[in-house]
Amino acid sequence: MIVCKTPEEVLDQVRLWKAQGKRIGFVPTMGYLHEGHASLFEECISKADKTVVSIFVNPAQFNDPEDYAKYPVNTEGDLKLCESKKVDLVFLPNKETIYPDGIPDIVLKIPNLMKSLCAVSRPGHFEGVLLVIFRLFHFVQPDFAFFGKKDYQQYLLIREFCNTLAFPIEVIGCETVRSSQGLALSSRNSRLSETEKEESLLIYRSLKLGENQIFSGIKNPLLVKEIMKDVLDSSSKIRLDYLEILNADTLDPLEVLEGEILLAIAAFIGPVRLIDNLTLSVPTS
């Protein structure tokens, strides 16, 4: 496995592979890797000839400096996991490498997909995501890029970003990996106590209850949201950020629960903010 710390090293290796006719797959991460990331690596390896993983905690996407400071780091463990999964190249830059002149004063937006969810509750977050992805795509020049659907809005934004700018990159969304009890795997879970992990299972239970209500025939989104919210309100440890039911393609509000549907929750368990979602396909009447 090759480990690169500069864009020049990455570009040199990628150009060599492309000269050999190899297709490049890319999985950008912020490190503290877990089995959810490993599933992205496996998807990438199955589709691409060469797999590149980046590990970079991007300061531009944190609207809370304390959240950035507390983001977990385990570089040694991350490299071991990448090697065990047969990743070909790990790009391990630092902040000065990605932003040599500091974080630039440029704003990247896709307004139609940034009217709700994390775009509203974390101002500036997705602008920072799009900025770093733009740079990483420039350095890695991938044919395919893989993103987990746990961060569903991010996946939609990056897919639309590539389409709008005519990047020759296929953006592939991969299903959320969960614990045996249903908790979506996340690097932030490491900051939860065992009691908080138990409480956080209510997020998935709320989503599954919403799914069951919709498939039972309920068409009113407000009614389903109230039923889902009751589950979360049963715990004093959960502080709801948002609970939304939206069109899964456009992120627009729904008046009737039909077609492609996104159920999305963000909530704080203690100081830790977790997100999760389900997507449903409901036949129209």
From Swiss-Prot:
Record-listed ATP binding positions: 30-37, 148-151, 177, 185-188
Known catalytic reactions: (R)-pantoate + beta-alanine + ATP = (R)-pantothenate + AMP + diphosphate + H(+)
Residue positions binding (R)-pantoate: Q61, Q154
A single GO molecular function term of this UniProt record: ATP binding
Pathway entry: Cofactor biosynthesis; (R)-pantothenate biosynthesis; (R)-pantothenate from (R)-pantoate and beta-alanine: step 1/1
Compartment(s) where it occurs, according to its Swiss-Prot or TrEMBL record: Cytoplasm
Active site: H37 (proton donor)
Record EC number: 6.3.2.1
Binding site for beta-alanine: Q61
A GO CC annotation given for this chain: cytosol
InterPro entries registered for this protein in UniProt: Cyt_trans-like (IPR004821), Pantoate_ligase (IPR003721), Pantoate_ligase_C (IPR042176), Rossmann-like_a/b/a_fold (IPR014729)
Superkingdom of the organism of origin: Bacteria
Keywords: ATP-binding, Cytoplasm, Ligase, Nucleotide-binding, Pantothenate biosynthesis
GO BP annotations, alphabetical order: pantothenate biosynthetic process
Keyword ATP-binding applies: yes
General function of this protein: Catalyzes the condensation of pantoate with beta-alanine in an ATP-dependent reaction via a pantoyl-adenylate intermediate.
Subunit: Homodimer.
Note: The reaction proceeds by a bi uni uni bi ping pong mechanism.
Family: Belongs to the pantothenate synthetase family.
HAMAP family: PanC
Database matches in NCBIfam families: cyt_tran_rel, panC
Protein name listed in UniProt: Pantothenate synthetase
Organism: Leptospira interrogans serogroup Icterohaemorrhagiae serovar Lai (strain 56601)
Gene name of this polypeptide: panC
